[in-house]
Design a protein with these regions (language model features):
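Short, Lys/Arg-rich flexible segments
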Residues: 1-155
Length: 155
């Protein structure tokens, strides 16, 4: 049994399609990065305000000494949410650096507070919050891919 196969290929259409994709790629990458960076900042902020670690679980409890302090009594939430005035999480932002984005704290004092909370410097317990959990990491990959494909016209 012999089969005949004829393939018709329009090279002009293929070339134009590839040009369109390559033209839209830089903008698509930057916009997709901005979208996932905003999502990452939202997730870090939201989970921290709920007192959750990035991969689940709760932060180490406040010390008994802190629970007796005037500062603690002024606090709205009595669970560990790393918020006293709200300046640290409000200064969390992202910036585009070419084909990568970085998450950072806008003010130096908030950066220092975040480092102390995240690493547990001195007598402070470790309360890792400035990270992306596995579940959110997969969601970020999905958001990036869908937005990128939409903007480039792939698929």
């Amino acid at each position: 049994m012999v089969a005949d196969i004829k393939i018709k290929f329009n090279t002009i259409d293929a070339t134009n399609y590839l040009k369109k994709i390559s033209k839209n790629t830089p903008r698509a990458i930057k916009e997709s990065l901005n979208r996932v960076s905003a999502y990452a900042v939202d997730q870090i902020t939201e989970k921290t305000q709920k007192g959750q670690k990035p991969d689940g679980g709760t932060f180490a409890r406040y010390s008994e000494m802190y629970k007796q302090s005037k500062q603690f009594k002024k606090k709205e939430n009595k669970f560990v949410d790393l918020k006293f005035h709200g300046h640290m999480l409000n200064s969390l932002a992202w910036a585009n650096r070419g084909y990568k984005n970085i998450l950072f704290f806008r003010r130096k004092t908030e950066q220092i507070k975040a480092y102390i909370h995240d690493t547990g410097v001195g007598k402070m317990p470790t309360r890792p919050f400035f990270a992306i959990g596995k579940k959110d990491e997969n969601k970020i990959k999905d958001i990036f891919a869908r937005h990128y494909y939409k903007l480039t016209g792939i698929r």
